[in-house]
Each structure stands twice: as structure tokens, then as C-alpha cells.
Amino acid sequence: MMNKERFARVVEEMKRQGLTQILIADDPAIFWLTGRIVNPMERCGAILLKDDGEVHAFMNNLFCFEPIDGMTMHYYADGENPYKLIADELAPGKVGFDKNWASKHTISVLKERDDIIPVLGSDPIDVCKSHKDEAEKEALRHAANINDMAVEFGIKHIDPSLDELTLSNMIEEFFEEHGAVQDMQLQYVCYGKNAAEPHHGAVAGEMLKEGDAVLFDLWAPINNYWCDMTRTVFYKSCSEEHRKVYEIVKAAQQAAIDFVKPGVKMSDVDAVARKVITDAGYGEYFLTRTGHGVGMTVHEPPEASPSCDLIAEPGMCFSIEPGIYLKDDVGVRIEDLVIVTEDGCENLSGDIPRTIEDIEAVMN
């Protein structure tokens, strides 16, 4: 059914941003608003929302997108022109287009009308989706709990006879057994110097050696909400240099988590973590942003980065994941998801060990 409260929130945000009409085509956004899953692939599928609350849906008649109370449905068949259907309902002037809509769809709508001005229209949805309600928070907690179990599973199954890809596939199967719906997404399992590549994908034939770091960056959708968590462990032994790097990253992450509360800039969350690493002499090896939003997608606003001046507000969920990446040597990243509360934040993976000693206890 149509979530009237969420539509109303988006309309209010549209008005605040000076938008009178937006086209919504992002599958997770449509699901968030309607509870309906749409996967049009190359076909056109979109919702038009106006600032008076009027809602239109434009769907191919093959989509099985049933009529919804309060929404005007416009169906088209293969071979018919859906863009004229959309254009006929647009008022002259600015139209907010979905940032994730393929350009062929945007251009095709623009060809139908010469009196509309395309602008980016995803911000009202992004702002509203970033503020999780209680049901969404509970879904994120549940997903994080499964992720915690997957990380522990991975740590306990570290074995020199398993290459990265084999262990990654084992974790993938664990997720699926616990309700995750994966879409050909390999979990990041990185041995040794491969952990120094922030987005290294697990590969066949990469074997484990004593003293290697093992970086697990695991994520999955559970009941339509994502989890995302990273732990770095060391196999059998840990050099003093690697231990030093690990402790710096752990301190940076904790400093950022302690800093999070309503009213702080997301860029300052990044700055707090970055300062710890920079002051320790490793600033040039912190290659990524500090975090990203998580919800119905694994990467969504807000992000904790130097360029993001969004303000942290209650209900926002994002990762805190500083790292140090020493090329051809080691990479250390520690990641947890937090939800902003009224006076700080809730760490969704707070029970999973972060000290080297506690992680070794899990391994053994």
C-alpha cells in the first residue's frame, strides 16, 4: 500500500527545496514509498510526485504493479511511448529528475516537451530516506546482528588451506542461510597486501601466510535493509608495525563514534577520524572517506567525508570506517554502523570484538 506518511514527508521536503514536481525512478525509493518492488531493467518505470500531493505512476503492463489507492496509474505496452504519458502530466517549468534514472529515459522525456527545465530531483527523497523510523531502525539492527554472526563465522573459519575466494563463498552461503538475498556480490576477504586495496575483491589462488592481515568487509540485504561491517585480524602473529597501525585505526574509529551526535557536520565526523590518523603520521595512507549512509541500499546519503556538510540528525544511519592502507604491505580497516540518537549514537555492532586480543580469542 502507498505509505502516505512518507509521501507527505517528501512533499514537505520538496516545498522546502523549491521543487513542485519530481520524477522518482530509483527502485529502492519506489519500494520505500509504495512497498512494491519494481525492476524495469531497460524499460521505463517512474512515479511523478507533485507538491500538492498528487501522485502518478507510469509502468509497463508487464511489471505486475497493481493499482494503489491515492495513485493515478498509467500503463503502457511494449511498442508504446511511455515518455509522452509522463510529459502530458508535467507542468511547465522545473522538473526534478531522479539521479539514478538512465539518461535515455530523462532525454526521452525532455524530447516530448520544450517548456520544462530539468533539475536534480533526488534530494527530497534522499533527505527523507536518511531519517529512519522505528521499524527501519529495528530492521537495521536485525541485519547488523546477522552481519555480526557472519564476521564471527569468517574469523572462525580462517584456514591456510582456503584461498580468499573460497572463504568469501563460504561467508556468502552463510548469509543466504540466514535470510540474505545476494545478487552476485562477493564479500571482501583480503589476505596480506591485498588488504591495502580498499576495495579488493576476493580472488582464487590467493593463499594465507603467517603474519598476514585478513580483512573482512561483509555486507548483505536482510529483509530489504542492508548491513555493512569490517574487521581486520592477523593470522597467527602480528608485527609491531602492524599492531601500531591497527591501534591507530581503532583509536580513530572510536574518536569518530564518540563525536557523533545531533547537530555535528558529517564533514567534521570525517575530520575527527582523519586527525587521529594524520597526527600519528599516516594521514597520506587514509585513502577513503570515513563513512557512508546505509539503509535500503548499502551506499546512500549521508556520507562522512570532507565534502559533506550535511548535519547529523536523529535516525540517520551510517558507517564509521577509517583505515590505513600501506601499499604492498598491509591494510587495516574497522567498520561499524551507527544510528544517531537524541544525544549521541547507537553502535549496531558494538558487541563484536575490536581489540586484537579479543579477536584472537574468537579465532581460537
Question: Model-predicted segments: where are they?
Answer:
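Active-site neighborhoods and metal-handling regions in enzymes and metal-associated proteins
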Residues: 1-364
